[in-house]
Amino acid sequence: MIDINNTLDLIKLKFYNEWLYTAHIYDEGTSPMHETLTKQVIDQYVLPLNIPKNGKVLDLGCGPGYFLNYMREQGYTDLTGVTLSPEDVKMCEANGHTIKKYDMSFLPQQDGYYDESVDFIFLRHSLEHSPYPIFTLMEYNRVLKQGSKMY
């Protein structure tokens, strides 16, 4: 929560916005190795969590959509990727995925990200790209349902 009456919060917000709109957006590109590793992670760590097949699942910093592709193959239906990379957006949308084009640190309520509304968050190799990871994690804690997991 940013307090607009607090000068320090405004300075942080200004810094963050400048960083966000001038920083290079990490574009992973396509990689058979990353695709294979993503499938292994899903098989070993995600599927055993028994996430409901119709549960709301987010892939934050989704890259070219390997997680989204494989989860759809496993029968999951409510999948959303979040990225700022135009190349990744194109690849994911070409595969029929729902993609949100905004900063993964802020999940807007107008898009349905209410308190305790998400069943699972996947953010492999994404959190390190947040300038304020503690705020990002607080946001994920806000939207995750009680007892839900994040990888």
Please report, for each region that a protein language model flagged, where it lies by residue:
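Short conserved AdoMet
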Residues: 52, 131, 145
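A short glycine-rich, Lys/Arg-flanked "PGG" loop and its adjoining helix->strand segment in the class I
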Residues: 134-149
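Conserved N-terminal segment of class I S-adenosyl-L-methionine
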Residues: 1-116, 120, 124, 137
